[in-house]
Amino acid sequence: MAEIPLYFVDLQDDLDDYGFEDYGTDCDNMRVTAFLDIPGQDNLPPLTRLEKYAFSENTFNRQIIARGLLDIFRDFGNNEEDFLTVMEIVVRLSEDAEPTVRTELMEQIPPIAIFLQENRSNFPVVLSEYLIPIVVRYLTDPNNQIICKMASMLSKSTVERLLLPRFCELCGDRKLFQVRKVCAANFGDICHAVGQEATEKFLIPKFFELCSDAVWGMRKACAECFTAVSHSSSPGVRRTQLFPLFIRLVSDPCRWVHQAAFQSLGPFTSTFANPSRAGLYLREDGALSIWPLTQDLDSGFASGSPAPSSGGNTSPASLTRSAKPVRSEPELPVEGTSAKTSDCPHSSSSSDGPAESPVESCVSAGAEWTRVSPETSACSKLSDMNDLPISSYPGSDSWACPGNTEDVFSHFLYW
């Protein structure tokens, strides 16, 4: 069975029993499922070996099998008898006494359903006889982690009508802090399930309460899911409400809270960027991905800064209407430099010609910036950085003048 792919990244040299018993939870990123295609001492075929580990007494073995179910379906889905055996394993795992195994299985149900829909002609039968009963049973699962995972599988109207009111009540539960902690840990999943409008109307106020909770574990959980909440909010709410709230978490006196906030800083910052300009975007599942830059970036620069050939033909009035300069907050003065800085570089008047207007100066700076390649620009900036006062850095001025704050941030991420 050499064609069977292995599911993890690195293969360890020694796998005495071709299993996971000696590796514990640290092998999440290891390639430890070699038991499927490496003949072991038991000389079992791959499918029988799969059953052995799926029904192992070791919880971690069963977790790994549940986590790799999609690949298992790809391997054994062509043979009808093997497929039915795998479906029986899925049913057995769905009834596992260990909540972590059921949670792993629940996360695999949507991709498994998509795969079976594309590859099985009898998908309606498989859906009604196997998958739907599992989903219905998990809706009443006693473990709250599994119920929270179910929210992403329901429609927005259903979640908002049935789950959202109760979830908001539990967020304010003052009897047991463990209840609020579970709500905080799964806040991002609920925001994604109900959508932007309900998030801003009902959940953002509750999120503010949880971020100000006296128990530091609540604030830490909020810092960990901050990116998901930001992703479900509009740009206005993101700037005016979530950004100051995140600053509070970064400055939290508890080291565990501000450490979690710093770990979320990069993903949270990326939610402010324009994907076509910055090259980054968040997928539906909250994962940070790369946006293709080739055409979008060129068009973005062309729209953000006027072309050099047309710079002289554009009037200052039309420029102020199309691209309003952004006033940045004054920076703290540095010893030896003046604290007064201008938003756009002004050209001093001379006897050779009339003085250049502030807007035209901004336009020329932006156009010059677009003509410089990233490599040349980076080298020139670094070589001249120590010789320039703070107010003379062309990077900040050329970013701030042509566009809005989102463009400034996008340029910063790109360069």
Curated annotation (Swiss-Prot):
Database matches in PANTHER family: SERINE/THREONINE-PROTEIN PHOSPHATASE PP2A 65 KDA REGULATORY SUBUNIT, WW-BINDING DOMAIN-CONTAINING PROTEIN-RELATED
Domain of life of the native organism: Eukaryota
Region (Disordered): 301-362
Biased composition, class Low complexity, residue ranges: 301-318
Gene of this entry: PPP4R1L
Repeat keyword on record: yes
UniProt keyword annotations, A-Z: Repeat
General function of this protein: May be a regulatory subunit of serine/threonine-protein phosphatase 4.
Organism of origin: Homo sapiens
InterPro entries registered for this protein in UniProt: ARM-like, ARM-type_fold, HEAT_type_2, PP2A_Regulatory_Subunit_A
HEAT repeats: 86-124, 163-202, 203-241, 242-280
Protein name: Putative serine/threonine-protein phosphatase 4 regulatory subunit 1-like
